[in-house]
């Protein structure tokens, strides 16, 4: 689990992805849509909530995801 603090002060908790999470998004061709779906699932947020994030906050979540996968 990782806690990520967003620019507005909100703290988001992201769990480590499992293979089943990766399988769920495997059929999504667009890379950005795939990342949004994965982040929404791992952070227990809706895709609309992810869409409403600032670019900086999205990047923070994406970097946390990449840390899990590397």
Residue ranges and their predicted role:
Residues 1-70:
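Short, surface-exposed, charged amphipathic helix/loop patches that serve as local interaction elements
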């Amino acid at each position: 689990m990782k806690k990520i603090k967003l620019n507005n002060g909100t703290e988001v908790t992201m769990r480590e992805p499992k293979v089943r999470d990766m399988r769920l998004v495997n059929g999504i061709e667009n890379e950005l849509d795939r990342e949004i779906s994965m982040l929404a699932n791992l952070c227990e947020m809706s895709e609309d909530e992810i869409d409403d994030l600032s670019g900086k906050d999205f990047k923070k979540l994406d970097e946390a995801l990449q840390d899990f996968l590397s």
